[in-house]
Each structure stands twice: as structure tokens, then as C-alpha cells.
């Protein structure tokens, strides 16, 4: 929720300094988490970590929007979001290696007795402070303009003003609204995917640490391939067809949907099963560049960070919450009714997420008209 306020703030102030503040803030409270003595002392720092994290993506996307041409924004936004598949991969690899008693001794020592969970928080916090302060070395050209012009538009922009402009954009641009809606439906699938590793262990017979390691390796390469493919091809699609990038996601989702269904029911020794696993991480990498670039292109420049913050609020608060909570409830309700409750729950939420397909199609068809209307209005 704080992201909406931080997004509006990013449209008014020096963005490099704001990113530095946000990263340093959450890094300090990450270190504070390592000193926690109980639930309250762990929960309170997490709240401030969320405030700091809410600054990064809206502000970064706004910076990218000002420094990359529109026809290359799909790749730029996708490359920024490369952190998602890589972060998932690293976490799975760490979980797999730490849980596996056959892991290399140096890994067990480093992540276990030598540092411990508190030490991990301290280490990440110190690293974050260093990275945050390094942002002060980058200059925000727009920030310089704000300082030198006392009557700039950014100075005049208030939070309520930004919300009015955003609401007007949502009313007047079906492409914007449907791109956001498609993102929400996709994140319902991602929310349900919190049970993916449990499904692989409980209903497909994998060892927990082994499948975590395998998934981590797949996530690295498939995620990277997805980021490059999604960014470059969606930019090419827009340039050659003048159809919005969501049309690219429409075709991608439509083509990959049958494989996503089939691999839920085949044996893990078959090729189609592993193709399905790879495609899941590949599609994740493809998603972010086209959608984040599109939502920025369909609003006035002065609220780019605000619309990104609103988009993140929607996909997290609605998409991930509905997906994770709904799938968990469905698993509990179907245990004892179905032999494989995780399989059916993931499949059902996969079909719910498939509602992204018509959303992206209509958004892509409307894109050129809505973009032209925006440029005329400006």
C-alpha cells in the first residue's frame, strides 16, 4: 500500500536519492531483523522493510522510462526484472543445498554454524547499505531540472493530483486497465505456485532438496531466456506491427497453456513434464518487460512511477493474495476428496489465471488507439 504513496513521491523528487534512501532504509531494518528476540521484534522491522522496498520498483521504472526510447522499454523493463527469476533460483538453490546433508562442507559451514540465520540478515543488510549509497553516484536529470525550475510541473504535482490523473487514465484507456487486469490474473497463478515445490515432493515423489536444486538451476537459465526473449521480441512486435506488447503475451500464453495443463498429469520421467517445468520459469521471465513498459506508455510521463506503484499494488494485493490464500484453502478442502489435491488446486488456479489471455488480447488491440488519444490529450 505504501508503494502508491512512494510512487507519487517518485514523480516529484530526485529519484536517485529516493532509491538510495529506500534501499538503505530496508537494509538497516534487515540488520535489525537479525537482532530479533521474538515475534514483535521481528514483525516491526519487516513493516519498515516493506516501506523501503516499495520505493525501488516504481522509482526505477520511472528512471528507465526517461532513459530508454519507447521502442526499447520492453527489454529495459524485462532486464530490470531479471532479479525475479534469478532471486527465485538462488533461494531454491540455497534451500536445496542447505537442506541436503550431502552438500559441500563449505556451504554448510558458511550458511549454518559459521554465520547462522542472524548473520545472514546482518550480511545482507551491510551489502544493501553499500548498494544503496552507491545510488548517490547516479544523477537524475529530471531531479536537476526540478532544482533549477521553481515552477516545474513535478513540483506542482500533489498526491491527490497524481491520483486524479491516474483515475482519468484508467477510465479513458481500456488498454491500460486490461493490461493491469491481465497482470493480476497472471499473479493469481504465481500466488498458487507457492505450493509448487510441495506438489513436486508430495505428489510427484521428488526429494525436497534435490528438486529445489534442480528447480533453481532451471530457473536461472529459463528465466534468463524468458527475460531476453520477452523483452526483445515484444519490442520487435510493437515496432513491426504497431500492436501493443500485450498481444505478444496473448499469443505466448495461448500457445503455452496446453503444455501447462498436460504436465500436471504426466509422469516426471517424461519429456513433457520437464518441458512444463522449464516453460513455467520461461514464461515468468517473459512477463514483466512487456507489461511494465506498456502501463508506463499509456499514462502521462509525470505519473509513470505512480502507475507502476498502482500496478504493483494490484498484482500483489489482489493477484498474489487471492492465488496463495485461495489455493491453500482449496488444498485443505479437497484433501480426502481427491487423491492429488495439490495437482487439482494448481490446475484450477491455472485456468483462473488463463483469463489473462483475453485481457492481453483486447489490451493489445486497443493499445495504438489509446496511445494516440493520450498523445493528443497531452
Residue ranges and their predicted role:
Residues 1-39:
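Conserved MFS/SLC helix-loop-helix module at the cytosolic interface between two early adjacent transmembrane helices
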Residues 14, 35-41, 52, 69, ...:
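Helix-breaking motifs and short loop linkers at transmembrane-helix boundaries and internal kinks
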Residues 17-31, 245-261:
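Structural signature of the two symmetry-related core transmembrane helices
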Residues 44-85:
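Cytoplasmic helix-loop-helix junction between adjacent transmembrane helices
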Residues 80-140:
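Helix-loop-helix hairpin linking two adjacent transmembrane segments in secondary transporters
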Residues 133-139, 257-266, 347-378:
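Multi-pass alpha-helical transporter architecture, strongest
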Residues 141-178, 203:
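Juxtamembrane intracellular "pre-TM" segments in multi-pass secondary transporters
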Residues 169-230, 284-288, 292, 319-327:
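Extracytoplasmic gate region of multi-pass secondary transporters
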Amino acid at each position: 500500500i505504501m508503494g502508491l504513496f512512494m510512487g507519487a513521491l517518485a514523480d516529484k523528487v530526485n529519484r536517485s536519492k529516493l532509491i538510495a534512501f529506500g534501499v538503505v532504509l530496508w537494509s538497516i531494518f534487515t540488520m535489525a531483523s537479525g537482532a530479533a528476540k521474538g515475534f514483535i521484534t521481528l514483525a516491526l522491522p519487516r513493516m519498515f522493510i516493506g516501506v523501503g522496498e516499495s520505493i525501488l520498483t516504481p522509482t526505477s521504472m520511472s528512471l528507465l522510462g526517461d532513459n530508454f526510447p519507447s521502442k526499447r522499454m520492453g527489454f529495459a523493463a524485462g532486464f530490470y526484472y531479471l532479479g525475479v527469476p534469478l532471486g527465485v533460483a538462488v533461494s531454491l538453490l540455497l534451500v536445496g543445498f542447505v537442506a541436503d546433508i550431502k552438500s559441500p562442507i563449505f556451504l554448510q559451514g558458511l550458511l549454518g554454524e559459521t554465520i547462522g540465520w542472524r548473520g545472514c540478515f546482518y550480511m545482507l543488510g551491510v551489502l544493501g547499505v553499500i548498494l544503496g549509497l552507491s545510488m548517490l553516484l547516479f544523477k537524475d536529470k529530471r531531479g536537476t531540472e526540478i532544482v533549477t525550475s521553481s515552477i516545474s510541473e513535478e513540483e506542482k504535482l500533489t498526491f491527490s493530483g497524481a491520483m486524479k490523473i491516474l483515475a482519468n487514465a484508467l477510465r479513458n484507456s481500456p488498454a491500460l486497465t486490461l493490461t493491469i487486469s491481465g497482470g493480476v490474473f497472471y499473479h493469481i497463478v504465481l500466488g498458487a505456485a507457492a505450493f509448487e515445490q510441495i506438489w513436486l515432493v508430495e505428489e510427484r515423489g521428488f526429494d525436497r532438496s534435490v528438486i529445489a536444486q534442480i528447480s533453481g538451476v532451471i530457473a536461472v537459465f529459463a528465466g534468463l531466456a524468458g527475460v531476453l526473449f520477452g523483452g526483445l521480441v515484444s519490442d520487435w512486435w510493437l515496432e513491426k506491427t504497431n500492436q501493443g506488447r500485450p498481444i505478444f503475451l496473448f499469443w505466448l500464453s495461448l500457445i503455452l497453456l496446453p503444455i501447462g495443463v498436460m504436465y500436471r498429469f504426466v509422469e516426471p520421467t517424461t519429456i513433457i513434464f520437464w518441458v512444463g517445468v522449464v516453460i513455467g520459469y520461461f514464461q515468468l521471465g517473459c512477463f514483466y518487460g512487456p507489461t511494465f513498459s506498456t502501463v508506463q506508455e499509456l499514462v502521462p510521463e509525470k505519473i509513470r512511477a505512480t502507475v507502476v506503484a498502482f500496478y504493483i499494488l494490484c498484482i500483489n494485493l489482489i493477484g498474489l493474495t487471492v492465488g496463495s490464500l485461495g489455493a491453500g484453502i482449496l488444498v485443505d478442502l479437497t484433501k480426502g476428496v481427491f487423491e492429488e489435491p495439490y495437482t487439482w488446486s494448481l490446475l484450477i488456479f491455472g485456468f483462473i489465471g488463463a483469463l489473462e489471455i483475453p485481457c492481453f488480447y483486447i489490451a493489445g488491440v486497443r493499445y495504438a488507439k489509446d496511445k494516440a488519444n493520450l498523445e493528443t490529450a497531452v
